[in-house]
């Protein structure tokens, strides 16, 4: 049975102009007519206080009223966020989520208002896109025959496509064993080490962390594909290309976040024991959490394991089936009914997870972890527009700025939002 993970509903490159007053009176009101009842239930589920979104000085307040969700002109309560029209348009079209705008430094207002803004974001999507919040029992994990899915399965490239395709589409992740040779891994290790040595804190192309002993080190090299000839060769290797062909969605080597479509991207991650500061490990998140889900998902994020993935080296946990659920941060904090799979991989294995699968990395306890993340993007739709040079530069700056604003990013990811 063919399984698809292409859940796109919106073309990239739509008209960038969104007039706030016309939006609230027009598109918003129309969407409320279609999805408002369930979206109001979502807002009540999250226990959301009123939030005022002020766009270039013009305020509208979101709240749950007696008749459901309301967007009223004016200010109500203390929680006010400020956006310009470009940021508001990005929010409406889901080019950026509330979290993505906060991380990019494009939201005015106080910190608590930022948290409430992020908390309202899933309800905005519930209204505008009909993506309602997950309820217990809505996602099941089954084999093609209807039996419970064994989440500890491992696959090889010569197993054929049917079994890994079903598992990946059902669970949102997969583990492929023995993909690359020791010689190839040694070459990648050497090129990653050279990139780490060349990195500087202000280079705009790396994230930095610190250990309890005070050592600062580059924990993520953002432009590794440009610094690693060996990696570029492997990304054109039939073994790697076969991973993108497991599903029938036409995935091709490219940015797994979707933002750069067919541009090859790769990041080298280094996680040292005792890291206590920085973004060496990310808490529970979806790769599309900063925006673009309705335009790009699901891409395939590929992790080339240069060290084992285990308790000693640090792990990778995935909430199985979470790519098929719209999940708010407050639901994550309260606990989900979906099982958590803890991946155990060896050097040379490859992890695969979908861009909208909820996952986290855990700190190493006794040995350094090294991994290279790259991936596959869905092919552009007929109405899509590739990012131009200015967009490309902005995307790179925003990606680099995540670490520069790590306190805000971690707060938004870890606290109820």
Regions found by a protein language model. Give the residues of each.
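Short Gly/aromatic-enriched secondary-structure transition segments
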Residues: 67-70, 189-193, 318-320
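Non-heme Fe(II)-dependent double-stranded beta-helix
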Residues: 145-170, 177-282
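Histidine-centered metal-chelating micro-motifs
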Residues: 89, 289-290, 356-360
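Hydrophobic beta-strand signal
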Residues: 108-109, 175, 352
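Feature captures hydrophobic
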Residues: 1-159
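Conserved double-stranded beta-helix
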Residues: 2, 323-417
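Catalytic core of non-heme Fe(II) oxygenases with the double-stranded beta-helix
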Residues: 242, 249-252, 275-344, 383-388
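Short glycine/proline-enriched turns and hinge-like loops at secondary-structure junctions
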Residues: 63-64, 74, 294-296, 364-367
């Amino acid at each position: 049975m063919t399984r698809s993970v292409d859940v796109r509903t919106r073309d990239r490159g739509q008209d960038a102009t969104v007039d706030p007053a016309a939006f609230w009176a027009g598109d918003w009101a129309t969407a409320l007519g279609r999805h408002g009842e369930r979206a109001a239930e979502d807002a009540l589920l999250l226990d959301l206080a009123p939030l005022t979104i002020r766009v270039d000085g013009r305020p509208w307040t979101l709240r749950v009223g007696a008749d459901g969700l309301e967007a009223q002109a004016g200010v109500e309560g203390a929680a006010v966020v400020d956006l310009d029209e470009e940021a508001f348009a990005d929010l409406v079209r889901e080019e950026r989520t509330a979290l993505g705008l906060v991380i990019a430094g494009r939201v005015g207002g106080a910190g608590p208002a930022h948290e409430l803004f992020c908390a309202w974001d899933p309800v905005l999507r519930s209204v505008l896109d009909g993506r309602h919040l997950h309820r217990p029992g809505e996602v099941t994990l089954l084999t093609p025959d209807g039996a419970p899915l064994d989440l500890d399965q491992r696959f090889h490239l010569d197993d054929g496509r049917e079994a890994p395709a079903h598992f990946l589409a059902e669970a949102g992740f997969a583990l492929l064993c023995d993909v690359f040779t020791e010689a190839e891994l040694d070459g990648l290790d050497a090129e990653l080490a050279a990139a780490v040595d060349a990195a500087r804190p202000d280079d705009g192309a790396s994230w930095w962390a610190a250990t309890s002993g005070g050592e600062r080190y580059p924990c993520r090299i953002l432009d590794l594909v440009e610094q690693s000839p060996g990696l570029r060769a492997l990304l054109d290797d039939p073994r790697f290309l076969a991973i993108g062909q497991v599903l029938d969605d036409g995935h091709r080597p490219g940015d797994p976040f979707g933002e750069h479509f067919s541009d090859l991207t790769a990041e080298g991650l280094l996680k040292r024991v005792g890291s206590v500061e920085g973004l060496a490990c990310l808490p529970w998140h979806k790769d599309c959490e900063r925006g673009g889900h309705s335009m790009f998902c699901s891409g395939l994020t590929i992790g080339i394991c240069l060290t084992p993935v285990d308790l000693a080296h640090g792990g990778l946990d995935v909430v199985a089936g979470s790519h098929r659920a719209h999940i708010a941060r407050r639901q994550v904090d309260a606990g989900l009914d979906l099982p958590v799979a803890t991946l155990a991989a060896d050097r040379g294995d490859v992890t695969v997870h979908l861009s909208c699968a909820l996952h986290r990395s855990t700190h190493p306890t006794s040995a350094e972890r090294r991994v290279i993340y790259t991936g596959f993007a869905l092919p552009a739709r007929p109405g899509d527009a590739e990012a131009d040079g200015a967009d490309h530069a902005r995307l790179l700056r925003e990606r680099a700025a995540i670490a520069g604003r790590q306190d805000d990013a971690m707060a938004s990811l870890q606290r109820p939002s």
